[in-house]
Amino acid sequence: MRQPYGCRIASSTVYAHPAWYANKGYLVLVLDVRGRGDSGGQFLGFKQEATDGDDSLLWLRNDHRCNGKVGCYGFSYQGLTQLLGEQPELAPDALAPAMCGLDERQHWASEGGSHWWALSLGWGLQLAAESCRRRNDQPAWDAIRASLLSGEFLTIGLALLAEHDPTNPVLKWLQRDPLSSTGWSQYQPGPLRLQRPMLLLQGWSDPYLRGGLDLWRQAQQIGGNTRLYIGPWSHLAWDRRVGGHDHGSQACSNVDQWQLQFFDQHLRGHDPIAQLHCKAYDQLSQNWRERDPGRSSELLFALRSNGLAAARSDEGELVPASGAGQVVWVHDPWRPVPGRGGHLGLDAGLVERGDLDSRADVVCFSSAPLKEELELWGQPQLSLKLAADRPGFDLCVSLSVLPRDSARVLQLCTGVLRQLGEHCRSLSRRTVQLQPLLATLRPGDRLRLSLAAAAWPQVAVNPGDGSHGPGASGIGHQVITLHTVLEDSALTMQPMAPHPAAELGRKGV
């Protein structure tokens, strides 16, 4: 494992301590990456990791304590370090990269054309604090730490990064346009690495899920030996409780046991244990199921309203027939709609959002009580016609369940779309992709779709002037009026990791 947080932590925030693996007969090596912890050199982010990783693997394979086979594990940054290398012959014999992706723009820094705001600033400042510690800059470290403890980092974090850690890779991300691929890095493991035995561990409430699914799809495409587990977890919570929600006893993490079985098979030659190709946790029925990420369940709802779906949370409808009506609502930057839970929240996970849906700047559409069980498996997608009176707006979407036996509104997943330019003034079709999920609604439950023009601080508040803006609402932010026409609106389900043949079919090939 190679990580940028100090090797003594050893990712024990989510995994068992390396001593547990050592007691099972493994030599476990945890390294500081270049310019972090006690390692020399300058930290440059991911672009240093291919050559440094090769050097580490070569050294380890030649160590007298190594039997010649090497496995790697780790999540987030430590996940990507396993996948990068320039010499194919040095590739690990087995990999277990969790919660990471290959595309800096789409898998690490933004969604729907908008920067991850709170998440990116929080992580960037953590990296900056390590830079301050290494140069013994106590005042700068104190300022960063105080901003994180108080929440002030959401408004001054960008300035703190620029002042105290100007080469920070996350600062560079926040200075780039997430609507354009220009200037962003993408990493591509060689075919040999993708064909190695790979164990992919993901979470429904983790921001890097889409990156992990893309990695699974690429490995499958070239015949890789890949197992995929998707639990109900967030980035740092891998047990039954994620935030304030209890996912049941089956959600208690078996990650270390899974990894041990995986490495025993591929590094020590133990007999293989029967494993499902993909195991996913159903967030409502609270059990593990075998599913194919290349397929999705069937879902088709349209949106209908007589114009009061913002003023009343119970007026808008999700209907199996055609959509009808229109809704006008106003985004006031002085009181932007909060983002809550989901995969982009600092409070990640399933959350109650009934109070948010009661706001008059949130547009709600609810189904009738279901007559039969409804499984949601895949990536929800909303398509509708929408215009604004400014050259910029955000569309922030939440999908929730209204359980039959309570007054709760339990948010299941979210998505965001940022639009900039004069085309925002035209009534045009807009499409939002939400976080993938597996959740089975019971007969009598209802499904709800909620629309807003902000999700602060998960994403920066759109200033409405055609620019991305500085984060929080400021003196130049505009009031934005949004108008949606619901004819031809559609809430559908798409595969979360389409098989190559399905992708070609959609392209008409």
Regions inferred by a protein language model and the residue ranges of each:
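Glycine/threonine-rich phosphate-binding loop and adjacent beta-strand/alpha-helix elements that clamp
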Residues: 255, 268-509
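Short beta-strand/loop motif that positions the catalytic acidic residue
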Residues: 194, 200-202
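Short amphipathic alpha-helix adjacent to the substrate-entry channel of hydrolases
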Residues: 3, 11-29, 216
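Alpha/beta-hydrolase active-site loop
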Residues: 45-64
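Glycine-rich "HGGG/HGxG" loop immediately N-terminal to the catalytic nucleophile
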Residues: 11, 35-45, 239-240
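A catalytic-pocket lid/entrance helix-loop region that shapes and gates access to the active site
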Residues: 73, 80-143, 223-261
